[in-house]
Curated annotation (Swiss-Prot):
It catalyses: H(+)(in) = H(+)(out). In absence of cGAMP, the transmembrane and cytoplasmic regions interact to form an integrated, domain-swapped dimeric assembly. In absence of cyclic nucleotide (c-di-GMP or cGAMP), the protein is autoinhibited by an intramolecular interaction between the cyclic dinucleotide-binding domain (CBD) and the C-terminal tail (CTT). Following cGAMP-binding, the cyclic dinucleotide-binding domain (CBD) is closed, leading to a 180 degrees rotation of the CBD domain relative to the transmembrane domain. The pLxIS motif constitutes an IRF3-binding motif: following phosphorylation by TBK1, the phosphorylated pLxIS motif of STING1 recruits IRF3. IRF3 is then phosphorylated and activated by TBK1 to induce type-I interferons and other cytokines. 2',3'-cGAMP binds at S162, Y167, R238, T263. Residues 1-190 are annotated as: Mediates interaction with ZDHHC1 and ZDHHC11. Homodimer; forms a homodimer in absence of cyclic nucleotide (c-di-GMP or cGAMP); 'Lys-63'-linked ubiquitination at Lys-150 is required for homodimerization. Homotetramer; in presence of cyclic nucleotide (c-di-GMP or cGAMP), forms tetramers and higher-order oligomers through side-by-side packing. Interacts (when phosphorylated) with IRF3; following activation and phosphorylation on the pLxIS motif by TBK1, recruits IRF3. Interacts with RIGI, MAVS and SSR2. Interacts with RNF5 and TRIM56. Interacts with TBK1; when homodimer, leading to subsequent production of IFN-beta. This is Stimulator of interferon genes protein. The chain crosses the membrane at residues 18-34, 45-69, 92-106, 117-134. It is found in: Endoplasmic reticulum membrane; Cytoplasm, Perinuclear region; Endoplasmic reticulum-Golgi intermediate compartment membrane; Golgi apparatus membrane. A motif (pLxIS motif) lies at residues 362-365. Residues 339-378 are annotated as: C-terminal tail (CTT). There is a cross-link at K150, K236 (Glycyl lysine isopeptide (Lys-Gly) (interchain with G-Cter in ubiquitin)). Keywords: Autophagy, Cell membrane, Cytoplasm, Cytoplasmic vesicle, Endoplasmic reticulum, Golgi apparatus, Immunity, Innate immunity, Ion channel, Ion transport, Isopeptide bond, Lipoprotein, Membrane, Mitochondrion, Mitochondrion outer membrane, Nucleotide-binding, Palmitate, Phosphoprotein, Transmembrane, Transmembrane helix, Transport, Ubl conjugation. It comes from Bos taurus (Bovine). It is a multi-pass membrane protein.
């Protein structure tokens, strides 16, 4: 099963398997019709009749929906009746063209069914009316989920973009400088590759306590990073702060990092607890996974997040499990150290013979002193 690199339970976007299955079904039906030995014009006649009935049914359904939307023209469509018509008959051009083509073939081919057109139209209207009244054509939950993901209608999509634009995009660019200032006054407490990043915890059950020590006694608050302030939405000097925690292993300090929960998960949890939101526990889990995946996609294309942020996604264990949040975080910190070590090892590998055979080229800087790795000195 395809999944995100963050956690095995986070799904990837849906693919084209439904279309592939439809293609297989199409091939099987064509073989079955060929095996039955019916004349091609007979098969085409009934196929056209069925397609015309489907498109006519969609047209009738759209007209019924339009009757409701016309009552909301000013509040939903800014007084434009044409926009209301387009909202109800969005694919009317395609359906209309197919309907005209079907009617042409229906009239030109012999009427083997010998059914009056008026009778079929009345029967179609009766069938569609029953479908609307009884809700027989409702979308399956998987279809609703696919539409929401494709059109970015999910709660998770809005939360992820809000979290990035309203928070991460503001604090991540200045995070290395704040860590450097902190180290100057605290004897380089934040050392190593993992210590120079913001680590964001993502419990998929959305259980976010306000005190990390409650989640795991081996996670202890140490200090706060120097504050960052910015003018936001009319608030002068809005303050952003981040906390530094030490991670204990066998009673000894095993790691130090900038750590916090993803605060939008609290929103998802609160929505699932409030009946007015109509948000079930299953919805919460699905939206939490989509939130992680969407934020991962956003950060992958955000230059300010490069090497400044790491997402730690985990599934809250069942009762009696030996899961330890501090060990999960330490595992990520150690993995980051290994990644840096492997990267430095690869860059120091002896070059091939083709490279050694080239003339050496000296790259000499005109500056007296080497520049630091920070980009804000320019």
């Amino acid at each position: 099963m395809p999944h995100s690199s963050l956690h095995p339970s986070i799904p990837q976007p849906r693919g084209l398997r439904a279309q592939k299955a439809a293609l297989v079904l199409l091939s099987a039906c064509l073989v079955a019709l060929w095996g039955l030995g019916e004349p091609p014009d007979y098969t085409l006649k009934w196929l056209v009749l069925h397609l015309a009935s489907q498109q006519m049914g969609l047209l009738i359904k759209g007209i019924c929906s339009l009757a409701e939307e016309l009552c909301h023209v000013h509040s939903r469509y800014h007084g434009s009746y044409w926009r209301a018509v387009r909202a109800c008959l969005c694919s009317s051009m395609r359906c209309g063209a197919l309907l005209l083509l079907s009617c042409y073939f229906y009239c030109s081919l012999p009427n083997m069914a010998d059914l009056p057109f008026t009778w079929m139209l009345a029967l179609l209207g009766l069938s569609q009316a029953l479908n609307i009244l009884l809700g027989l054509q409702g979308l399956a939950p998987a279809e609703v989920s696919a539409i929401c993901e494709k059109r970015n209608f999910n709660v998770a999509h809005g939360l992820a973009w809000s979290y990035y634009i309203g928070y991460l995009r503001l604090i991540l660019p200045g995070l290395p400088a704040r860590i450097q200032i902190y180290n100057q006054f605290h004897n380089n407490t934040l050392q190593g590759a993992g210590s120079h990043r913001l680590h964001i915890l993502f419990p998929l059950d959305c259980g976010v306590p306000d005190d990390l020590n409650v989640a795991d006694p081996n996670i202890r608050f140490l200090h706060e990073l120097p504050q960052q302030s910015a003018d936001r939405a009319g608030i002068k000097g809005r303050v952003y702060t981040n906390s530094i925690y030490e991670l204990l292993e066998n009673g000894q300090r095993a790691g130090v990092c900038v750590l916090e929960y993803a605060t939008p998960l609290q929103t998802l949890f609160a929505m699932s607890q409030d009946g007015r939101a109509g948000f079930s526990r299953e919805d919460r889990l699905e939206q939490a996974k989509l939130f992680c995946r969407t934020l991962e996609d956003i950060l992958a294309n955000a230059p300010e997040s490069q090497n400044n942020c790491r997402l730690i996604v985990y599934q809250e264990p069942a009762e009696g499990s030996s899961f330890s949040l501090s060990q999960e975080i330490l595992q990520h910190l150690r993995q980051e150290e290994r990644e840096v070590t492997m990267g430095s090892t690869e860059t120091s590998v002896m070059p091939g013979s083709s490279v050694l055979s080239q003339e050496p080229e000296l790259l000499i800087s005109g500056l007296e002193k080497p520049l630091p790795l920070r980009s804000d000195v320019f």
